[in-house]
Amino acid sequence: MTSQLITRLLPINSTTSPSIYETIRQYDDDSGHSDTEERAAMAVDEENLDGAYQDYELEGALAQASDTQSTHSSFQSPAAGDSHLPRHPKWTQESVNEAEHDDEVPASLLVEGDGEEDPLPPPPRPPSNRNRILDDAPAAEFCSPRLRGQWEAAEEHQTPHLAPQPSPPLNLHSNRRAGLAFANPKEKAMWRWANVENLDNFLKDVYIYFIGNGIWCIVLSRMLNILTLAFVVGFTTFLTNCVDYRKVPHSKTLNQIIVPKCTNKMSASSTFFLWLFTVFWFGKVFQYIIDFRRLRHMHDFYLYLLDVPDSDIQTISWQEVVGRLMALRDANPATAGTVSTKHRKYIGSQSKQRMDAHDIANRLMRKENYLIALFNKEILDLTLPIPFLRNRQLFSRTLEWNLNLCILDYVFNEQGQLRPLFLKATHRRALSEGLRRRFIFAGVMNIFIAPFIVAYFLMHYFFRYFNEYQKNPSKIGSRQYTPLAEWKFREFNELWHLFERRIHMSYESANMYINQFPKDKTVQLSRFVAFIAGALLSVLALASVIDPELFLGFEITHDRTVLFYIGLFGTVYAVARGVVPDDAQVFDPEHALLDVTAYTHYKPAHWQGKLHSDDVRKEFATLYQLKVVIFLEEILSMIFTPFVLWFSLPKCSDRLIDFFREFTVHVDGLGYVCSFAVFDFKKGTNLMPPEPQHHRPRGLKHGLHDLRGDYFSAKDGKMLASYYGFLDHYAPPARPSGPHASQRQNYPQQPVPGPTHRAQPGANHLHSSRIDRWDNGQHSTMRQSALRTSRFGAITGVGGHASPMASMLLDPHHQPSMSGFRSKAHPTAASRYRPSRQAHPMADTIQDVDEDQLPGINIQPSNVTTTSSGGPATDDSQIEESWRINLAEDANSGEDDEAEDVEKVAGGGGVLGLIHQFQKVTNEGRGAVGM
């Protein structure tokens, strides 16, 4: 209901063209018949789908086909024929004829005939004294003439027998449901799993149940949330309406200042909103009670099908849950056995065969991936339309909620699928105008809602943090990442709990970086204030210890006792002391920021060479704000959000519509997803190192090609960082050797840096020199090993050893291929998802060169080999910065450098070098190396 609020409230101008919402609804209804991409592209295992038909469903389908054909004309149009039982599913229409000779039963005997255009003729009417089964028998097209003749011959030699007419499929289905009431919980859970119709919503429930730590933790959390809501509103009402503050100075008990029957004396507006809140509160309670049944079903799914009890759900990893989901999929591959015609329209995007770690992440983050891309491409205009704040961006949880309501609920339908109408350029203007109206309408709604939300959050923040700040004043200076920073740092297909873990690990490094910069004037003033406040506090504390009964009641100023000043000076001392940095801290802001980016994976190109500057610190400080400042910005955003919705966001409505059309791809069995979220594992996401500038053809045409490539690629290496981050979460934890070892990084396993870590000058020097070599754009050559693909999809070498990149949580078509990491001398194939997209640059490996190495010695790339024993042979320190993409281009390299790179890829050394390598490989018993 919330997702359709703006759609239903916006007026429709009947005097002009039809509303875009009417067009969207009509196109959604007709998309199952008109979307040629859905019909052609969705390819799912035909046998699994046909295997879902049961006997009673086949009988019901035949009966319905006979009834329908007897009442309709044989000259029915093809469009009307679609209203009958579905024929071949959309993803099997092309593969039926190819696989017909392999089936035991020919396609002519199946319910779903081959004819896509011609309707079925009415069945022949048998004599009345014949078997009743023949009345419901299929037409001649449902069986071959030979089988039909055998059937009639058998009927002539046997006594007619009136068999009971099969019940309608609805009654049989109802009886099957009634039988589930007496089944055991495991059978019930299996039946629900087999009849899942919307896999996106089901997997979302599975993930919410996982991060909620089980049924009882979720129930307790919901109860405490509604009780907290009731307490904040009730206590605020009591403080504002039931206390006579004029009597406080002259009263000694609470009863003297309480207003009797205060609710009867409340204003009409306060009474109305209190009743409105009461209705909302009881509605939430009723919703939670109704939702308990769904939680119970999810509890049974985890317990009986995944074998994960509530006692283990807090300790089991999500990767283990994904593995058990894949095992359950392999054990029960069929989709829902009985689905309606309406649901079969989009069943191609609900295939349970497409359910490995990559597909599950794409389903769970179908909408979030688009938001991540929007922030990465900087398409959203979030600047404040105020003269003195035009360069400042405003983004808060309130604005995030409005973006979901205005954009995502506009682009996606009720089933969570992207509306196909947004992929048509013909409706661009109407869709853009509809989005513009949604922004304006949401701004108007925020004006009426903002006062109540501001009051609630102010009271909630006051009740929650005042006592904490009063006891520990140093926490006033604590920081956290802003909502805008979270969307900039989050990667494609990165689930929330994995992202939250990665970001939490960066807090210590971020605090160290903020405290690194010289603030000598502030530090000197803070030390002076801390000294004065500490001296006064020590004297008062010592006097109160000597004679507490006399001195604690002593008034230093009018009505201000010693106890008051002890608390005041203690607070001032704590705040001033918190500003002064630790004396043992080592000053190295560049190294500290590199430690932060190792976790956040965020390092814009304009930061290059400026990590020590104050400009970079100011930019990072806007992403890592004080908690108090974030709260104040959240409150102020409720006031300024309508202006952003009215003036800033409508300017980018055209770009938003173009974005969803140009960055959406269709994946078989998965549906429409963001193009950046589809990782091409076989080609290493097509990420290749860029060519030097002087090797590129010059001219206007190539300049336009570069602009197009930049437009269709992610900024700041987001695509490659997401790819490696995904492999780190779902690939084996052991780091492989060879080319991939220098490209991947196990982010959560990095040690948290500290003062002891920085105090090692040797490690610091090696770390800095390695980063310098990386940032200077030195390309290291990589040897492409002779690889072959096993029948299970894992990449194996010539010796038969499995690829270290293979993962049990990825299907064979998603297994990463080491052959995808090629040298820049080899051309890369275009992506099958968007042929026009330019290949992304691949991150360069970090080449560690010994300091005592002579400059004249040429080390062949064949020395950096992939160990066949499976043990890691790569320095772990190389992985520390491997997630970055080197976007800089070396403009000083010449033709000799390119020739040298090609020679290195080929193995170097000419014919003698090749003979030497062949002898070496033969002696060591390995496959071809460096060929």
Swiss-Prot record:
Intramembrane segments per UniProt: 439-459, 628-648
Catalytic activity: a 1,2-diacyl-sn-glycero-3-phosphocholine(in) = a 1,2-diacyl-sn-glycero-3-phosphocholine(out); a 1,2-diacyl-sn-glycero-3-phospho-L-serine(in) = a 1,2-diacyl-sn-glycero-3-phospho-L-serine(out); a 1,2-diacyl-sn-glycero-3-phosphoethanolamine(in) = a 1,2-diacyl-sn-glycero-3-phosphoethanolamine(out); a 1,2-diacyl-sn-glycero-3-phospho-(1D-myo-inositol-3-phosphate)(in) = a 1,2-diacyl-sn-glycero-3-phospho-(1D-myo-inositol-3-phosphate)(out)
Biological processes, Gene Ontology terms: autophagy of mitochondrion; lipid transport; piecemeal microautophagy of the nucleus; protein localization to phagophore assembly site; reticulophagy
Pfam family, one: ATG9
Topological domain ranges for the Lumenal compartment: 236-271, 549-560
Subunit structure: Homotrimer; forms a homotrimer with a central pore that forms a path between the two membrane leaflets.
Full protein name: Autophagy-related protein 9
Organism of origin: Coccidioides immitis (strain RS)
Lineage: Eukaryota, Fungi, Dikarya, Ascomycota, Pezizomycotina
